[in-house]
Amino acid sequence: MNRPSLSTLAILALLSLALLGLRMFEFTVSGAGLHVDEAQYWLWSRDLQWGYFSKPPVLVALITGSTAVFGDSLLGVKALAMTCWVLSAWVLGCLAYRIGGMRSAVFAGGLFSATLVSGLLGLSVTTDAPLTLFWALSMLTLWQAAHASGYRATCWWIACGLSFGLGVLSKYSALALGFSALWLLAMAPAGQRRRIFLGGLLACVVAVWVLLPHLAWNMANQWPTAQHTLEITVQETGSTVAQGAGGWRRVLASGFEFSFGQLLILGPSVWLVWFWLWRKQRDDSRHSGALSAGLTEENGHALTASRLWSPLTYALAFSCPILALGLIQALNSKALINWSVPMALGVCLWLACWASALRLSLTRLVWACGAGLVLSGFIATSGDIKQWMGLTTQPHQSKWDIWGRMRGWDASLQSLKPALEPYREIPWLTGDRSTLVQTAYSLRALEPKLYAWNSDGGVHHHFEWKQPWPANAHDPAVVWINPSPPHPLLLSRYPHARQLAGAQSGRVTLQVWLLQTQPTQP
């Protein structure tokens, strides 16, 4: 296999840096702030732990590193998460190179970079960023381990276990990699299965060692992350959906919504390349055996003799299991199209190897990637898409703006800052998680003492668990910052209340109250 030249690698590296710069520019132009979850992760990153109420720790550690290097600005919070998507494309390209040569690598990395999931989620700080990177690393290291021998194979299996473990510490859906591994074990040649099985056991042992601190943290804290995950998956059964409005029609609608969403997040680049390949293979029967055989390298020699799996088999193993689990979950509760994000890696790998086998021109790749990048950029920067379609958004209707929930927080909180600053030394209470985390981020210069309060005393999110307002608190005065006025139960403890200020921007409406046990002395 011909090695890529340094000039080729340099060009690809420059294109990757340009893509990262484009993503940062798109987010800046969008005018969006942090999503509530992003602000929550940022707040968690102030206190590194081996786990959190609803998420494992890798993304939070990533934000800690990002802000340590780039500061606490919006792009500073997002920088390393954005970089994960670019690195994922490189890792996928490296795998495609090992399977089918440089042409396959360029197609794989380019296609993945141009998907809508990379172009839009790539602007956000989500657990999908490190998950996708470690999923790609698991794909690469497993391939390398299975095709190596001796000491090199052992090192690759250890690397595979590290990738798997860190993937699970990014997002629990990485456990679906276990089904991918079983798929590949079953599809491997009979004479190789024992070696692959033993190597897989070594990888599992390494992964367990990686997970031990997180498991110990969960055990010490009564398994909050595991319980939260079960609550939003297993315990929300199909009967819960079926008994709701619409019955089983709602179940089917949820499944259809999820399935259609998977087609959408691949974007036009993937579907254009698929169409061109389908038409090319149909029109040229000389290449009809290329896909089933695997692929041919640039020098024309068959690569299948030393390969344990065909590119199609390998790609399906890393796409179908997580797609199936996502569909099951969609039928059980509701459809979230990002549940199966790593499936895009397998799809792009398959198309890249197919494109290399059929010698699809790089010009077609450029056009396809251009279409994907233009569409994702338009969606990211256009605001309310209804306006572009000549539609008017009524006051009671939602806008077609993917950043709608990220707008208005900073403007509202900055307008409240003068009213809040004199009270920075006393506790600030809120009954709304979004308000708590957005206040912590936007007014971080004030270092507010924020506490979660609710009337039932239950634990519904991380801050009601770790930062609850104690029932026996004796503070003579507190600040209430919330979308709604103070609850009567809270007013019974602090009967002297006066509103200090209010603010509204976009969807965000906030009120600030000073609550006291005794009236202010004149």
Go through the PLM ranges and name each one.
Residues 16-19, 108-116, 164, 168:
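Short helix- or helix-capping micro-motifs
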Residues 97, 103, 138-156, 186:
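Membrane-interface transmembrane helices that cradle and orient dolichyl/undecaprenyl
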Residues 47, 108, 155-172, 206-208, ...:
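Membrane-interface alpha helices of multi-pass inner-membrane proteins
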Residues 117-131:
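Short acidic/glycine- and proline-prone juxtamembrane loop motifs at membrane-interface regions
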Residues 337, 362-423, 434-437, 441-449, ...:
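Membrane-proximal, lumen/periplasm-facing interface regions of secretory-pathway glyco-
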Residues 89-91, 130-149, 159-164, 347-350:
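Specific aromatic-rich, kink-prone transmembrane helix
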